[in-house]
UniProtKB/Swiss-Prot annotation:
Glycosylated sites: 40, 204, 208, 238, 257, 268
Signal peptide positions (record): 1-32
Keyword Signal found: yes
Name of the encoding gene: GP
Name of the protein this chain belongs to: Super small secreted glycoprotein
A GO cellular component annotation in the UniProt record: extracellular region
Disulfide bond residue pairs: 108-135, 121-147
Localization (cell): Secreted
Keyword annotations: Disulfide bond, Glycoprotein, Secreted, Signal
Superkingdom: Viruses
Organism: Sudan ebolavirus (strain Human/Uganda/Gulu/2000)
Taxonomic placement: Viruses, Riboviria, Orthornavirae, Negarnaviricota, Haploviricotina
Coarse class of the protein's main subcellular location: secreted
Similarity comment: family membership: Belongs to the filoviruses glycoprotein family.
Length: 319
């Protein structure tokens, strides 16, 4: 199992090799290349050899497929913003393509959405599809929605990245990142260009400190998912929520969670307590540009008190 972990790109070797590679972005909208199709829970993945111009290659060993995350291009990664990039369509079969290596993702998503009648909006993952294994934050959302279509696609034509497999659709209950597939053509084959994690490392591993990161989970409830106007609630506990109405960072949500607990503002009844953020709150605190450039979040008592005084201005209690 461990030997099947997602291959990683060593940053130093990637930078050195970048002068000698051609990067071809495989966007489904831009290129009409044949892809594998999910049929009856089986995966048929097109061989890469059939997709390249062989007169440009001395050997197909020079060709490496890599998953690149959209968050590196600066897209908003909070749940309200991300869900606006996804939409439902009918009559279009899912397509998949495999890739050999991938980046670590700062933000991944995991959806469990039901229709008003209780049926599932999203299909289960086909056999062999595992969640994206390198996520700093996993945004787990449950809820309901009209889900007007058979499958949830990316409106910009990007892929949903799973463990070494990119799909055009979202699968239920599986971690994924948004991204595209690039083909790297190396000047000469290098066996060490793509390195595998330790052989005993688990695929969905979160605790081994040797990987220099740990996965944190944030939970949400979404109402009217897939419609033009939806409501996203950040879950503090089973009866306490915060309504999210603007872009924000994961670090801000953790600060919010800590502040509500610190000031004991949890629901103390069987009803639901829903906090509404003050319009003057800065939700961009602790933004991370990339893994290597982490800004220290301001975990001070002064900050907590200021946020507390401001965001508790409004609240809504439902029973």
């Amino acid at each position: 199992m461990g030997g099947l972990s997602l291959l990683q790109l060593p940053r130093d070797k990637f930078r050195k090799s970048s002068f000698f590679v051609w990067v071809i972005i495989l966007f489904q909208k831009a290129f009409s290349m044949p892809l594998g199709v999910v049929t009856n829970s089986t995966l048929e993945v097109t061989e890469i050899d059939q997709l390249v111009c062989k007169d440009h290659l001395a050997s197909t060993d020079q060709l490496k497929s890599v998953g690149l995350n959209l968050e590196g291009s600066g897209v908003s990664t909070d749940i309200p913003s991300a869900t606006k990039r996804w939409g439902f369509r009918s009559g279009v079969p899912p397509k998949v393509v495999s890739y050999e290596a991938g980046e670590w993702a700062e933000n991944c998503y995991n959806l469990e959405i039901k229709k008003p009648d209780g049926s599932e909006c999203l299909p289960p993952p086909p056999d062999g599809v595992r969640g994206f294994p390198r996520c700093r934050y996993v945004h787990k959302a449950q809820g309901t929605g009209p889900c007007p279509g058979d499958y949830a696609f990316h409106k910009d034509g990007a892929f949903f990245l799973y463990d070494r497999l990119a799909s055009t659709v979202i699968y239920r209950g599986v971690n994924f990142a948004e991204g595209v597939i690039a083909f790297l053509i190396l000047a000469k084959p290098k066996e060490t260009f793509l390195q595998s994690p330790p052989i005993r490392e688990a695929v969905n591993y979160t605790e081994n400190t040797s990987s220099y990161y740990a996965t944190s989970y944030l939970e949400y409830e979404i109402e009217n998912f897939g419609a033009q106007h939806s409501t996203t609630l950040f879950k503090i506990d089973n009866n306490t929520f915060v309504r999210l109405d603007r872009p924000h960072t994961p670090q801000f949500l953790f600060q919010l969670n800590d502040t509500i607990h610190l000031h004991q503002q949890l629901s103390n009844t069987t009803g639901r307590l829903i906090w509404t953020l003050d319009a003057n709150i800065n939700a961009d605190i602790g933004e991370w540009a990339f893994w290597e450039n982490k800004k220290k979040s301001l975990r001070t008592t002064t900050w907590r008190r200021a946020v507390f005084r401001s965001f508790i201005a409004q609240r809504d209690r439902r029973r």
